[in-house]
């Protein structure tokens, strides 16, 4: 009977240890994803800004990675801007909308909101988008426009892209319908 109890105790300990290891692996992946999203500069364009101290824009913690606010104004660019303003591109005050020779691009909602974010995307959609520069990674999808440096992400490892995906799936969903890109004015 003592051997049976020791066996049960050992099984419980091994089960708990296995669960803790699995939990720490998931946590490590989320931490890695958060790190990559942060150093990758995702907040620079995908998080709306509020005015911080000293007039420096700061990320709006209530709208992390929610993209261009749906009712926010956006910049307009004309070919003469290159000569008259010496400007290749213009941006809004939140850095969530950019205009240039490609038209107007808007930082998409990266939160897991199913209606307006990437909640309906799969991990494969995300990794394919980062590798191909096509929205949702669809071969016939629209191009991911400047200033999104998707070409820098295409060289990342599958594990790193999966970690980013896991982190993006873990953040709060924010409903925010980002406008579709606009073609250049002729």
Go through the PLM ranges and name each one.
Residues 20, 47-106, 135-186:
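Flexible coil segments in periplasmic/lumen-exposed cytochrome c-class electron-transfer proteins
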Residues 15-18:
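C-terminal motif of bacterial Sec signal peptides marking the signal peptidase cleavage site
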Residues 128-136:
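Glycine-rich, acidic and aromatic/proline-enriched surface loops and short helix-turn segments
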Residues 21-38, 50-55, 75-76, 116:
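Electrostatic cytochrome c docking/interface patches
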Residues 3-10:
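Sec-dependent signal peptide recognition
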Residues 111-118, 149-154:
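Second-shell loop/turn segments in exported
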Residues 33, 39-49, 126, 164, ...:
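The canonical Cys-X-X-Cys-His
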Residues 29-32, 41, 106, 122, ...:
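Stable alpha-helical elements in mature extracytoplasmic
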């Amino acid at each position: 009977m003592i051997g049976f109890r020791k066996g049960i105790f050992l099984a419980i300990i091994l089960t708990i240890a296995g669960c803790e290891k699995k939990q720490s692996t998931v946590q490590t992946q989320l931490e890695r994803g958060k790190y990559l999203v942060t150093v990758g500069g995702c907040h620079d364009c995908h998080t709306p800004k509020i005015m911080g101290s000293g007039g420096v824009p700061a990320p709006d913690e209530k709208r992390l990675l929610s993209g261009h606010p749906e009712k926010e104004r956006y910049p307009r660019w004309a070919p003469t801007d290159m000569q008259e303003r010496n400007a290749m591109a213009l941006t809004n005050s939140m850095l969530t909308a950019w205009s240039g020779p490609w038209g107007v691009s808007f930082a998409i909602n990266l939160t897991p909101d199913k209606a307006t974010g990437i909640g309906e995307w799969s991990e494969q959609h995300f990794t394919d988008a980062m590798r191909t520069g096509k929205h949702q990674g669809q071969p016939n999808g629209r191009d991911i426009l400047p200033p999104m440096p998707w070409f820098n992400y295409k060289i990342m490892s599958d594990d790193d892209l999966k970690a980013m995906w896991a982190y993006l799936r873990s953040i709060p969903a924010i409903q925010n319908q980002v406008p579709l890109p606009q073609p250049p004015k002729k």
